[in-house]
């Protein structure tokens, strides 16, 4: 081997090692940041609040105590934002923010603001509102040992498992009502991309592909929603191996609306996994194939692969299904981080 080739090889190896180190450092930095935010939040609580917010990591009752419904209809455990001081609330939201990407936390805030809009629309109905969200921690916040952060209320259930440098967001439920509202003179659609990207993918299919993707029956709600842990369903619709490269890229971009909610380090790992699975991933559609410009679709759709199930389900409760949406994000092999924490 020539001196030049040796230098090139060594340089490439050094660069690879540096890149690898930076990748690990970013992941560790993310975990360190989340643990620090968790400890800061806990330090703001009094003894009773700490007792209410902390659970054993193996507490299955608490782990699965999440719902789409308002907290007055399905009781949550933990500490409610409404019961916190301004400093405690700020620390709680800083903790949630630390575990999410910037766009992910923005989506969470917009879902909560949507519930505030619903509260006002319903005559200040006390079962709605952006302060009716609970936070809880399962296990001890740690950079090494697994633990879990939960945050949720009406139309939101984040289940975030932290295991060393790995982070898992499944199962997570996002929803919104109204799906379109105005704030500070701007139109807000918290789950608008989830609708628009799916419709764009459907419209990118040719006639043969559309016939495969569109189901012959109607689905009106989530199949794998709250209370359906461990349930399995057969893939339906159009398999991505029958798509062209552009269509598969559009499917991955759609999936990223959920995968990228978690912080960037974990999202990168997750998207790499899902990209490797893409040819074994299915896209199914049920319902109308058009939407009013600027509004969300009124059709159900599902994305399903070896390590992911995503559902989008408009709701007829409240009238216009384009204005009331439920979505579900699962990993049938790793909900609650079970693959990472199995002994």
Predicted regions and their residues:
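Bacterial N-terminal signal peptides
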Residues: 12-21
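A cross-kingdom marker for long, charged
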Residues: 28-343
């Amino acid at each position: 081997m020539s001196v030049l080739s040796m230098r090139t090889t060594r340089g490439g190896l050094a660069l690879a090692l540096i890149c690898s180190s930076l990748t690990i450092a970013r992941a560790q930095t993310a975990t360190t940041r989340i643990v620090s935010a968790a400890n800061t939040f806990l330090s703001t609580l009094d003894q009773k609040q700490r007792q209410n917010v902390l659970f054993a990591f193996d507490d299955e009752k608490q782990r699965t105590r999440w719902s789409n419904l308002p907290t007055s209809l399905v009781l949550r455990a933990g500490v409610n934002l409404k019961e916190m001081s301004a400093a405690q609330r700020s620390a709680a939201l800083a903790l949630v923010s630390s575990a999410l990407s910037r766009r992910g936390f923005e989506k969470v805030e917009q879902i909560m603001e949507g519930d505030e809009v619903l509260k006002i629309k319903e005559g200040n109905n006390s079962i709605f509102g952006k302060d009716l969200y609970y936070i809880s921690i399962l296990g001890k916040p740690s950079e090494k040992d697994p633990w879990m952060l939960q945050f949720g209320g009406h139309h939101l259930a984040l289940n975030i498992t932290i295991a060393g440098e790995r982070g898992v967001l499944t199962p997570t439920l996002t929803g919104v009502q109204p799906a379109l509202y105005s704030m500070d003179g701007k139109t807000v659609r918290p789950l608008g991309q989830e609708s628009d990207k799916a419709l764009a993918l459907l419209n990118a299919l040719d006639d043969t592909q559309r016939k495969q993707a569109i189901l012959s029956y109607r689905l009106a709600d989530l199949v794998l929603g709250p209370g359906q842990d461990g349930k399995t369903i057969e893939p339906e619709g159009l398999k991505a191996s029958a798509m062209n490269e552009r269509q598969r890229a559009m499917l991955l971009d759609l999936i990223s609306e959920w995968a990228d909610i978690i912080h960037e380090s974990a999202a990168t790992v997750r998207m790499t996994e899902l990209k490797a699975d893409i040819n074994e991933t299915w896209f199914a559609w049920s319902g109308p194939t058009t939407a009013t410009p600027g509004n969300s679709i009124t059709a159900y759709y599902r994305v399903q692969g070896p390590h992911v199930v995503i559902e989008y389900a408009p709701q007829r409760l409240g009238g216009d299904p384009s204005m009331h949406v439920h979505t579900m994000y699962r990993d049938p092999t790793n909900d609650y981080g079970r693959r990472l924490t199995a002994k």
